[in-house]
Each structure stands twice: as C-alpha cells, then as structure tokens.
Amino acid sequence: EENRHKLLGYLYGAWDYVKNSGKFPEAANLVLDWVGSVPGRRESRRFMGDYILNENDLTKFTHFDDAIAYGGGWSLDEHCPGGILNDKEPASYFHQRFEKMFEIPYRCLYSKNIDNLMFAGRNVSVTHIALSATRLIAICGLMGQAAGTAAAMCMEYKVSPRGIYKKYIEELQE
C-alpha cells in the first residue's frame, strides 16, 4: 500500500507539472479522467532459460526453430532503467520500432537448471531491453498458452520441459 501511494504521488506530481508549470500550453484543456487503482511495475525478476532472448534477436529478426510466440506491434523502449529516484546515472529513453514481427523461442520459457520450472510473462528469459518489447499483455498471453500447452505435454509424454524442446517442439507449435 505504501508503494502504491508513492507511485500515485509520482503520477499526480507529473500531471500537476504538465498542467500548472506553464511549459505545456497545449495541456490547458486536457483532463486526467482515469488512473489504474493498482500501478504496475514494468520490471520484475527474470529467470534464466536455455536461451536468453536479447535486443539483437529482436532487431535482426532472428528465426528460431522453436518459436512459440511472435511480437512486433510495439517498439523496443527503455526509460529510467535505474528507477525514477536514481540520481546516480542519467535517465535514458529510446524507442525503436519494428519493421516486421520477431519470434520468441520456447527455450525462454523453461529453466536451464531447475527441472519442471516453466515461466511465461514478464519473468521469461530475456534481457532488460528485450523485455521492453516482450512484456505486453498479448505477447505474455501467447507465452502463457505455449507454457500451459507444454506443461500438459510434459505430463502426457512424461518428459521435462526441455524434453518437449528436444522431442516434441513441432507438436507444441501446431
């Protein structure tokens, strides 16, 4: 609850600045009519899978034989990687749009060192920059569907998630 209040304070403080600083006359007639009741965090723990998806994979449109999800409707974007209160390093910000769809490999959805641990969503095996394009709800949903299907296949075939990659990836991709 304390963090929620802090985050809402930052949001309302930024809105107050935009509306009342005089530096944004185009905002004079704008209103803030809705704010989510639970502010979300962009970053979370990310686990290490057999493959760590990175920025180059996304920008060079690397093809993966074990692709289970696709993205590209949103750009790569980074801002304030150290957090909004970090005054030790300058804030960075960039957007890079995609020319076509990128692929997310199944190997990002299971642990490289813990049997039967799978993940989907913001905790998948990606770098900080790759997360900026893979964190979106639709892509997380695709990864969740793939992880759930793979988990069912693990039970059916009596194999680990890695076993699905080695023997049954084409069936998972159907």
Summary of predicted features, one role per range:
Residues 1-174:
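Flavin (FAD/FMN)-binding glycine-rich loop and adjacent Rossmann-like elements that form
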